[in-house]
């Protein structure tokens, strides 16, 4: 049984109401966009299932659902770079979340050791598309 109420057919209640009614997709997931609460840097995009969202709300520490490992994932549990949630928002139809976080430890969010998972820029030139590295300082 879900702790979150089902979305009503009344679109206005979803878009303008005060009830938090997250809309999970057919796989039981909701997209989570994560930014640094201090400077707004985009850190990562992940997914949450109902349990991950519930634990995030209960503990104030970001939890996600790993689609590749098919398991619950407390971000930073192994590295020490836990994500403390400062603010949690939802979009207009409540099918995406935005987490503003403080990252503990030395700050990397990406499993590659970088601050952000978005460390490459897509560049199109002369009919060719390539990736170029973006330094952590440029992010």
UniProtKB/Swiss-Prot annotation:
Q: Which Gene3D superfamilies match?
A: 4.10.80.70, Phosphoribosyl-AMP cyclohydrolase (3.10.20.810)
User: What are this entry's molecular-function GO terms?
Assistant: magnesium ion binding; phosphoribosyl-AMP cyclohydrolase activity; zinc ion binding
Pathway note: Amino-acid biosynthesis; L-histidine biosynthesis; L-histidine from 5-phospho-alpha-D-ribose 1-diphosphate: step 3/9
Alphabetized, the UniProt keywords read: Amino-acid biosynthesis, Cytoplasm, Histidine biosynthesis, Hydrolase, Magnesium, Metal-binding, Zinc
What biological-process GO terms show up in the record? L-histidine biosynthetic process
User: Catalytic activity annotated for this protein?
Assistant: 1-(5-phospho-beta-D-ribosyl)-5'-AMP + H2O = 1-(5-phospho-beta-D-ribosyl)-5-[(5-phospho-beta-D-ribosylamino)methylideneamino]imidazole-4-carboxamide
Subcellular location, in the record's words? Answer: Cytoplasm
- Record's cofactor remark: Binds 1 Mg(2+) ion per subunit.
| List of residues binding Mg(2+) | 91, 93, 95
Q: Which domain of life is it from?
A: Bacteria
Q: Required cofactors, per record?
A: Mg(2+); Zn(2+)
GO cellular component, alphabetical, reads: cytoplasm
- EC identifiers of the protein: 3.5.4.19
InterPro entries from the entry?
PRA-CH (IPR026660), PRib_AMP_CycHydrolase_dom (IPR002496), PRib_AMP_CycHydrolase_sf (IPR038019)
- Positions bound to Zn(2+): 92, 110, 117
Query: Which top EC class is named for this enzyme in its record?
Result: hydrolase
What this protein is reported to do is described as: Catalyzes the hydrolysis of the adenine ring of phosphoribosyl-AMP.
Describe the subunit structure: Homodimer.
| Family of this protein | Belongs to the PRA-CH family.
Q: Which PANTHER family match?
A: HISTIDINE BIOSYNTHESIS BIFUNCTIONAL PROTEIN, HISTIDINE BIOSYNTHESIS BIFUNCTIONAL PROTEIN HIS7
**Which NCBIfam families does this one have?**
PRK00051.1
Q: What is this protein called?
A: Phosphoribosyl-AMP cyclohydrolase
